[in-house]
């Protein structure tokens, strides 16, 4: 066994299986693409699932990968045990209907003993009782019965209850008695230990479970292998734990620069309690910063939602453990660069660091206060914690519930989570429900389709006479339809594009026997047949004429092509790390979702729009190229579009706009950028979790529709501003000219709106001088040791600004201010830096009928009539001790 770096081990794996004719699949992002069943990519095979189910055609029957994955279901064990991680890497080799048990075992043995030079004497094997082929194969490689451990269905049979399943064989490496004096009974009895390390698992998928525990042989047998990268590295580098390797030690060394504490590898055997806790904190930070960095790089922004909540939780857990090491300042953001080096991965270091720093700073502001609250509550309640305190720690101070639970566990304190269920549902929002919108309802008749029986010819043909290959209603195949219910038809050839890759289906007509029937929907089945939905009478054994709605197609092509140009322009504006998280193109508009660590400025969005219009003005021709995956990668084709799931990797269709972008795409596109005419961004809005959605339209018609809408919107704003100004200047007037040209009208009205806004602000500022003037000493009332200022004759328009300004200028005075409203009602504002404004208001509302609310610093309410000063003074004297 020779000592190798982690990067050398990974490359050895890839090169070894490439020599065995395996196609290398690069590590995919942690966020699953087109798979709502997963929160994260959580295994090496997760990104290849569609190849095994037959949904997608694999680039080769033999595949190899090194896939990064993320799991947080057992986060409490991270740092505590030798091998638990949030982010980990799985080495995988896979066979889809190609080699099987004998070759898979040969490859495993050869790689471990020849490439990694592990001594076979240190290898132990488990196998499924009854899997004689596997047993005999391992025996032929020199393994004795003592080294071959028989397993049960529970330990050595992969079965999800229904579908493909099969036995498995695990490979363990014996690290010797210094890790545990007990022998192979540790494996036999499934005892957690650090001596026998499982480094490899080969799953032989050879049966199908019908759901009733009846097993039938599969026609196509598969191999699914997973080898634990971090475990193999720790063995080859002789580290007692996974953390004692070049994957983690450089990160730990960087953490040590921020603290007087040191990580000590030798403590694994010494087991000094204080050092064990110190090591644990180092490990948690080193583990979490890897997951945090890679997840943010893959487009996840820290938030209180979904994946963003998990990343925020990891940041705060890591920051808390830094606190336990005496680190009282943000430091995690400094670790991003070293993470990139240890993972041999290129990151946008400045952007990721900035996001993490912002999270650390936000948490640091409330950490001390929140922790002190927790400590005080424990003292008051004699080491008991109330659910309401845990709720407040989350909502007010940003403590994830799980972090509070960990802090309490360290103090040996339990608390009941049952009362927090509703809270967790509301605030964790890590949805385990599958998405249902946009999914096709189950149509029983379509299960009768067993192969591809149709060709799409719509790239160049818009109408055709053809035959019907399949005709059905919801329940069964039919010879003709009755015209009363929805029906489904597959044609031998079709010009109608099916909804895919963010592009909506085509519209058009089926013509048969002088009857014209509208196409309602087009979608693909798993064989990539285009299934057309309609309502009308047609006969299967008679020819049909299909006619595309070309005007609708042009609008679809404009918007789909516009999406490509938008993606290219966004990469130009914000950098190549910009990713497409979703798109939706129909005949009316397009949308595009992308991650960014901040809100794009108006100037940046305008720059994106202007760049696209320059592409349009350049009149660039669109080209198509059909090639294989390897050639597409050489052309730097953008491979993230959703269309990829429908494509054969040996016959990929690229859409090319020279010098702008080359993208993998199966959709339809305009022939020249000039056909877009005009690209207009309608909005760029946050979807939460650091994801933004651009809505845009193409063509002059859509642009003018947009202008008309904006003009009406501006006119409404002008009218509102005019009314506000007239309340201050009753004689104010404004006449607007009628302009025919829409662009001129828009520009003119926008300027009027801006001018009015400026003028209105000037009027408010002039009124605000009241706030900046000296207080009237006659209106100051002394109640005990507190001072109150009462004034009920102030202007309504900026009363809240006056209250806030006076409070900041006079922090030792509490203000109760008022102004007349319509219908003889009266507005009251309470503003104080030293007393609870909301509690003062509550007392006011008890005496004077009304409603309102607020916070500690400022509160406002509405009462039925103007109050008398003497009543207020009496109220304050009677209740001053409660404020």
From Swiss-Prot:
Cofactor(s) annotated in UniProt: Zn(2+)
NCBIfam families per record: alaS
Recorded GO MF terms: alanine-tRNA ligase activity; aminoacyl-tRNA deacylase activity; ATP binding; tRNA binding; zinc ion binding
EC number: 6.1.1.7
Cellular component terms (Gene Ontology): cytosol
Protein name: Alanine--tRNA ligase
Main location: cytoplasm
Cross-referenced Gene3D superfamilies: 2.40.30.130, 3.10.310.40, Bira Bifunctional Protein, Domain 2 (3.30.930.10), Threonyl-trna Synthetase, Chain A, domain 2 (3.30.980.10)
Protein family per UniProt: Belongs to the class-II aminoacyl-tRNA synthetase family.
Positions bound to Zn(2+): 560, 564, 665, 669
InterPro entries reported for this sequence: aa-tRNA-synth_II/BPL/LPL, Ala-tRNA-lgiase_IIc, Ala-tRNA-ligase_IIc_anticod-bd, Ala-tRNA-synth_IIc_core, Ala-tRNA-synth_IIc_N, Ala-tRNA_ligase, Ala_tRNA_ligase_euk/bac, Thr/Ala-tRNA-synth_IIc_edit
Catalytic function, reaction form: tRNA(Ala) + L-alanine + ATP = L-alanyl-tRNA(Ala) + AMP + diphosphate
Co-factor binding details: Binds 1 zinc ion per subunit.
Keyword terms, alphabetized: Aminoacyl-tRNA synthetase, ATP-binding, Cytoplasm, Ligase, Metal-binding, Nucleotide-binding, Protein biosynthesis, RNA-binding, tRNA-binding, Zinc
